[in-house]
Amino acid sequence: MGNVFDYEDIQLIPAKCIVNSRSECDTTVTLGKHKFKLPVVPANMQTIIDERIATYLAENNYFYIMHRFQPEKRISFIRDMQSRGLIASISVGVKEDEYEFVQQLAAEHLTPEYITIDIAHGHSNAVINMIQHIKKHLPESFVIAGNVGTPEAVRELENAGADATKVGIGPGKVCITKIKTGFGTGGWQLAALRWCAKAASKPIIADGGIRTNGDVAKSIRFGATMVMIGSLFAGHEESPGETIEKDGKLYKEYFGSASEFQKGEKKNVEGKKMFVEHKGSLEDTLIEMEQDLQSSISYAGGTKLDSIRTVDYVVVKNSIFNGDKVY
């Protein structure tokens, strides 16, 4: 599989700029039948997204994926979003009642535009069976399947009918899969993305390990169509979860999707809880991401996201931060 590296080991090399202002650069991306303002999607986690944020994102042309931790609310959520002319994008698991849920959607003629099959180890017969089940009953839904970390997994899920695959096993900030199990793409997520993208014939969503806005551009360079981000989206005014004050500073809770806080029990725990500094409004963060990505495109010598895909890069093994951690 060649060179192993992660986000902080890579620098992209500038090409001649062809724009007068970064505002001429277009950050939009198409996934399935819809076009979105940014190639970025907040993680489908309980401390990152709720109905209110999903609505805000959809109304403003950002992609979103609703989490699956209140399964009984999904049908009303789909109805509500579609009645307002917005896309419905939901998550499902692979347990037996999820099969019934998909059939119920079909029976009620409810077709979410996007369905994400979301389990920790997505290279499994359970996921393959669920992809086929959704494609049989809801053929118009765009199916994202994951999470995976190998080219074999990408190929198998695509062959089963997945419209996109989500790549990343445990690189997230509140994910401790790497510590608890010894497995995953933590520490080499960017190389894993590159490896998987070479095998893919359909879009890839890079999931986890993003610590700076520049990492979004690096993900695009190594084959991602969309980039899923947790920690950078945690801690906003609008974010779910409680706000606490400590030493005069405001913090918000952020926990992983397989943490005991989310599961309500200490069994098969692969997530942890942390408090992140309060970041102000979500809108400001999205605008900053867009502006930074416009700058990335201008450094890549183009006007569209695709220009980033062909730039040269170097592996800087001493880390680009030289010990100065920015996160």
Curated annotation (Swiss-Prot):
It catalyses: IMP + NH4(+) + NADP(+) = GMP + NADPH + 2 H(+). The active site is at C175. Keywords: NADP, Oxidoreductase. InterPro entries: Aldolase_TIM (IPR013785), Dihydroorotate_DH_CS (IPR001295), GMP_reductase (IPR050139), GuaC_type_2 (IPR005994), IMP_DH/GMP_Rdtase_CS (IPR015875), IMP_DH_GMPRt (IPR001093). It comes from the Bacteria. Catalyzes the irreversible NADPH-dependent deamination of GMP to IMP. It functions in the conversion of nucleobase, nucleoside and nucleotide derivatives of G to A nucleotides, and in maintaining the intracellular balance of A and G nucleotides. This is GMP reductase.
